[in-house]
Amino acid sequence: IGLGLARQCLAEGMKVVLADLRPAPLQELAAELAGAGASVIAVPTDVARAEDVAALADAAFTGYGRVDLLFNNAGVLLSGFSWERSIADWQWILNINLMGTVHGIRSFVPRMLAQNSPGHIVNTSSLAGLLASPLMGPYTVSKQAVVALTETLHYELQAIGSLLKTSVLCPGPIATGIADSGAGHSLRASVSADANEQLMGFLRAGIAAGMAPADCAARVFQAIREEQFWIFTHDEFKPAYRARCETLLAGGNPVYDAFSI
């Protein structure tokens, strides 16, 4: 998704700062884009580390003088029963998915405010940011927190009369590698092993057939132009959002029926 957003920025004539945990692929991509005439700065960054994101902001403002669009997009995923995932697994996901967004806000927003000019911040949540499901505890918690954080930021910027706008991106299946982001975080002896395998197969199939990142990016930029807070990529999930809200207002108990455990 991040690469799709970067390519869309470049297609619209912008200068881009790229961040990724892996230095070698990041530099290769930057060289490829620069070779095609793009203005690109690449900064290896672990978004879980506040000092890394602060250095990323320094590089962006030093290199280009200003930042008008900020995309807090890094994300990872693990599955398994909530009580089976280790504290380290919980911390790993929350540090990247949630705290990475917090670090982005803290490092970039004060300087963007000081510019006193229009700008936009897009935080990537997920379908899971609005709909919980079994076996996705750490991921769902992190993504629902990103929704709450982005709403809070929206209200705060509104309260001070800022020209900065915010959006939260809640994508459905997008053709990315997120299903494999948890390699190396295997579940130990687990009562959820079969259900976990079923879920991951379901996710991988959906992601493989998912929306192209370029199409996702096009929707994001349309929302930026229209100053829309909520960005959805798959309208077919809206009935599920509505059903959840209706159940909540009726005081009903949640029911999950996408697949059986």
Predicted regions and their residues:
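Active-site helix of classical SDR
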Residues: 105, 142
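SDR active-site lid
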Residues: 159-231
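Conserved glycine-rich Rossmann-like NAD(P)H-binding loop of the short-chain dehydrogenase/reductase
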Residues: 12-28
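The beta1-alpha1 cofactor-binding region of Rossmann-like NAD(H)/NADP(H)-dependent oxidoreductases
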Residues: 23-24, 44-55, 87
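Canonical Rossmann dinucleotide-binding motif of NAD(H)/NADP(H)-dependent dehydrogenases/reductases
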Residues: 1-17
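Residue(s) in the substrate-gating loop at a strand-loop-helix junction
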Residues: 126
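Substrate-binding pocket helix/loop in short-chain dehydrogenase/reductase
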Residues: 81-82, 86-91
